[in-house]
Amino acid sequence: MLKKAKWKDDCLSPILLGIDDLCDGYFKKDYEKIFPFFDAGYGTSNDGSIFRYLNKNLLQKYPEIKITFFLPFGKGAYWDKEKSIINDIFERDEFEKFLNFVLDCDYEIAYHGHDHGLVNSTIDPNTWCCEFDQYSKEEYFEIIKSDLAKFKDKFGYEVCGGRSPGYKFKDDLIDGLCECGFKWWSFDYKPFINNINLKYNGYNIIEMPSNLSGDMFNYGKNPIKSAAKYFLNLYRLEHMIKGGQAVSIAEHFFRTRFDGKIQMPNIYNDINSLDFLFGYLRNKDIWYATFSECANYYESYNNTDISDMGDGVFEIKYKGSWKMFLTFISEYRYLENIQTKEIYEGFMKNNRWLFNDLVEGIYRGHQNVF
């Protein structure tokens, strides 16, 4: 027997954490000291920064967490330049070092637009001018291609996916995302819905989910309503995990909005909710993944075929466009690649042998060393 595991290491479900709006910005220009509730990334990992706050209160406690940071690559157009500090991500050496540190931690950087769009002083969603409405289609995607090329040149890193600010996008622009080389995109927030698909509206780009809010376990003023919300959200979360769904937690790096209101969800306000959530998940049979890791696995699972040729011989064929990234399950401890003569040894989980490093080819199963 040789078959595919639905998720890596035959885990029940992948857990993703996507954090929007990391940028080289700080809300109060006249403040000499950095405070986490005014920081969007300008403080890098220094004392008082929002990243230091996140690291101290969550990441050190749960080092298994994988994060995909969604970054606007240019200067945020909605920032008040008179009162705030805002740079594009390529301007400051200290921020460049910080992004290299983020990548060295095996976190992911994804695209979150160029300037995040324009907005009026009240941040009325009805008056939001999306990036793609500021330019022609050709101009818009030339900006994106330039951002991606510059990032790859500077960091040696290829950005695989992204998410539009506010999840706003037009279907007639999706072909442009494909032309830019994006393999996946997070198109919409759908609470407790497993919105992961191999193609989005027929386009060759993977739809990645966003389905949990990081503030889901924050307590409100009404204890009865808070308790009801708590148990309902736990039930929904359990249902997703047991159903093998991709769980994708949505958060924001920046707390303060420019109309004086608080942006929700946000890391600063939601730290206790996130602490409870990841504490609850710790004993679950789950896989912590970045968006690209999850997308790659999902693509591999749906594009890999196994043929049973009899007598313990199996053929693996992959017809996808990425490198195959897949866990296989077998009754055999050893699998011999008949073509290359290489022997792979599995690892035991739930009384079955698992393999993470198989490639395309024909394999013969063996129970013992030979």
Each language-model region and where it sits:
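Active-site beta->alpha N-cap acidic-glycine motif
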Residues: M1-C105, Y157, R163
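Conserved, mostly hydrophobic/aromatic
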Residues: D20, H112, G162, L177, ...
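A solvent-exposed, charged loop/short amphipathic helix patch at secondary-structure junctions
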Residues: G25-T44, D124-Y135, G260-M264, N269-D275
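Metal-dependent polysaccharide deacetylase catalytic core of the NodB/CE4 family, i.e.
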Residues: Y62-K170, Y203, L212-G214, A246-F253, ...
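His/Asp/Glu-enriched short active-site or ligand-binding loop at hydrolase and phosphoryl-transfer sites
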Residues: G176-N218, Y288, A295
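Catalytic grooves of carbohydrate-active enzymes
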Residues: N211-Y297
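C-terminal beta-sandwich/jelly-roll accessory domains of carbohydrate-active enzymes
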Residues: N302, I306-F370
